[in-house]
Amino acid sequence: MHLNTLDYERWDETVKDEIWSDTYSEGWKKLKKLRTDKNSNRDFNFDIIMANPPFAGDVKESRILAKYDLSRSVSLEKLKNAPQGANVVAGEPTFPEALNNNGETVYQMSDGTFRKTKLKQASNMSRDILFVERNLDFLKPGGRMAIVLPQGRFNNSSDKSLREYIADRCRILAVVGLHGNVFKPHTGTKTSVLFVQKWDEELCPKVDDYNIFFATMQEPSKDNSGDKIYRNTIDEDGNNVPLLDSHGHLIVKH
C-alpha cells in the first residue's frame, strides 16, 4: 500500500485521492481495523512486522520529526546544588528515563555533581532510526518484529540512545549479522537483523536480565558482484549440475 509510513498524520488526506482509492481502498479498510484508536493512524495492533527500511537520506521536515521520540537528543545540564525538594537519583539516566523526566528528578553523577536533563529536537534524523520507533508503534503488546538495520546501530557509541529506547519498549530476542554481499549490487553496507518482542504482561513480561541469541551468517548467498550463488550436485554421470527443489527451481546456497 502506497503510504508515507513516517508521515501518518497525512494519511487521511492521501486516502481521499480517487486514483489512490481505486487501487488501495480494500487494503486501507483492512488496515483501519487494526488501529488502536479509530481516529488516529499512529498506533496499530500488528502481530508480526518484517521490515527492511530505507537507509539512505535523512528526514529533515520538522513537522514529521516532532512526532518521534528518537528525533530528540538528551544533554545533562550541570547544577550548583540539587533544588530543594527535588527527587535525586544516583547515576546517569537512560534515554527513556530522560524522555519521561518531568523536571522534578535530578541526577547525581559519580563525581558528586548534580545534573538535570535537557531535551533538544534534532533538525534531521536518519530514516532507519525513525522506522524503528514507527514499527514499534505498529506492533500490539506481545507482537514481534524483525528489522534490518545497519551494523553500526548495534555498536556505535552515538547510537546508545537508540539501543536504550529499543530495550525499554521490547525484549531483544536475537541479532543476526548478515554477510556483506546480501544486498549487493545495490549496496555493500554491513547489516544485521534485529528480532524483538514488545513487552506485554502476559505474552512477554518485562524483565531486566535475559538471554539474547546472537549469530553470524556464514554463507554469503551472493558473490561479490551481487549474483546469487546456487547449490550444485553430482549427477549419475559424475557431472556437476545445479541442484533443484521439488518444483524444479534453483536452490540458493545458504
Please annotate each region the language model reported.
Residues M1, R171-N181:
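Conserved S-adenosyl-L-methionine
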